[in-house]
Amino acid sequence: MSKKILLIDGNSMANRAFYATMGRMMKTPTGISTNAVYGFFQIMFKTIEEENPDKIIVAFDISSSEKRTKIFSEYKAGRHKTPEDLTMQFPIIKELLRMMNIPIVQKDGIEADDILGAIAKKEGKKGNKIIILTGDRDYLSSTPAPASSNLFFKSSASAFAA
């Protein structure tokens, strides 16, 4: 029996959540920003409610992709450094995911979208319906298509509408 698998690009979603909620910056009593944490889980829970997946996997980048930089030296050259207020929130997001028993996949030198692309391809070949939750507009062009047509992309934008 086929399953519905929700794959989440953790870095993309945390970034999207952070910038979408900057106008209402939330902090703990000790001064740690939590708006990306709040937004990330708001997006995730809304998607779970809408899609009712059988399995959820979240992938994170833990370093830059040397492979992509070797292919294209200007890869991510124009991007700004990740704000410290956002960087401090990644461990919190990961810890909460672990507490919910949601698998986290990350590998040094391999970006989250490449990890999820490989998982999508493998699970798609099994006939599973794959939903990739990402805010990365280039995702479709950089992700290898699975063997089946059961691949769907969702953006986080609707989670912050209203």
Predicted regions span which residues?
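Noncatalytic, basic helical substrate-engagement surface that gates or grips nucleic-acid strands
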Residues: S2-L133, Y139-T143
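Serine-biased, low-complexity intrinsically disordered segments, primarily in secretory-pathway proteins
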Residues: A145-A162
